[in-house]
């Protein structure tokens, strides 16, 4: 039973955990070797509540920011101070980390679909769709999904 436990979005946690581990090992070198990720203030993350915390990312570097946040949050929560040395922190990743993303973007290819499974709260853009400007009403279900 525990093997098939799901999150509020219907994703199987066992699969999510393994995706985080695999993607983490693949991307660790980017943030640890190729680009040296500068971390400051990881002690703040340890003192945050378990629910209702929202971090905002710059859209232009979105996927890199999301992956970096997964690395930093998991490293910090497993006792590392301002460091992602030794990728062992991914063995038991925090599974209730989510980020807000455009539904259209998260369906655009294999990598976005995998990242969506790992933790996207997908919403519909109200100002743009498929490269065209639009004017949509905000979907209240999108807003309520953020609070799940």
Where are these regions (language model features)?
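A transmembrane-helix-recognition feature enriched in membrane-embedded lipid enzymes
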Residues: 1-40, 68, 109-117
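Soluble catalytic domains of membrane acyltransferases
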Residues: 33-148
């Amino acid at each position: 039973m525990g093997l098939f436990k799901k999150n509020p979005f219907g994703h199987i946690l066992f699969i999510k955990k393994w995706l985080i581990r695999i993607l983490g090992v693949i991307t660790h070198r980017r943030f640890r070797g190729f680009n040296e990720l500068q971390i400051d203030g990881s002690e703040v993350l340890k003192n945050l509540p378990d629910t209702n915390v929202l971090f905002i990312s710059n859209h232009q570097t979105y996927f890199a920011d999301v992956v970096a946040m997964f690395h930093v949050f998991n490293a910090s929560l497993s006792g590392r101070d301002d460091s992602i040395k030794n990728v062992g922190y991914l063995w038991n990743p925090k599974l209730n980390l989510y980020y807000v993303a455009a539904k259209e973007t998260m369906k655009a290819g294999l990598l976005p679909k995998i990242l969506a499974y790992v933790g996207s709260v997908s919403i519909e853009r109200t100002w743009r769709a498929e490269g065209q400007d639009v004017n949509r009403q905000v979907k209240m279900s999108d807003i309520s999904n953020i609070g799940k």
